[in-house]
């Protein structure tokens, strides 16, 4: 297991996806992207999983981003091939994306990133695709692609302004600078900042609070907030009402009040 670059573990309804390449500051190469995507699909299909948490091994970084050496090798290999423009364009949208961010963002389960040290490039894109971000004190986050000659993709220029507003998102993306955890918390990029030794415990604590809720309610709350934010208020209210009506028809919607009256923890069935 020590040789695996991405680790996967399910415990207490939480799926842990861990970047395990500390010697390279968890730089994400193509094989790792493939593994992360596969684990995301596994978690999404597992009825015993309600929350997915991403973290990085090693004390120095959640992830410094994509593996630049790996990218250079891919570029060199591509240059040796005389592909047509159509083939080149099709390859950009292959089954294995450049980052796992689009797959993470598409998950119905609640997702969380526990970031520490460097969280840059692909590392930041992964965390932006999550619902919750908790940072360790001293963490440094940024979008560095512009300094490598290209721009952030996989939602980097789209999710960031939706989280923190256009002016600050422009500053972060255009400068390529790194921002410390305290500043990221101030501007709303991360939900909490905790001491590094407490990072995993903080994630478990928040996940535990979420797990007290009914699984389908969690899912539809997430859907209502994300999809509703792209609608007018009137449309969003109608959408919220439709989802609420669906939730009220579930077994869990009957179990919750019953457990409250009987003064016991609810026994959620997820249906």
Residue positions per predicted region:
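Terminal low-complexity tails and localization/encapsulation signals of metabolic enzymes
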Residues: 3, 258-271
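Glycine- (often His-adjacent) and acidic-residue-rich active-site loop
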Residues: 56-103, 149, 232
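Structural motif
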Residues: 28, 91, 114-115
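Conserved CoA-thioester-binding segment of acyl-CoA-metabolizing enzymes
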Residues: 1-55, 72-73
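A short, glycine- and basic residue-enriched loop/turn
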Residues: 22-25, 60, 65, 138-140, ...
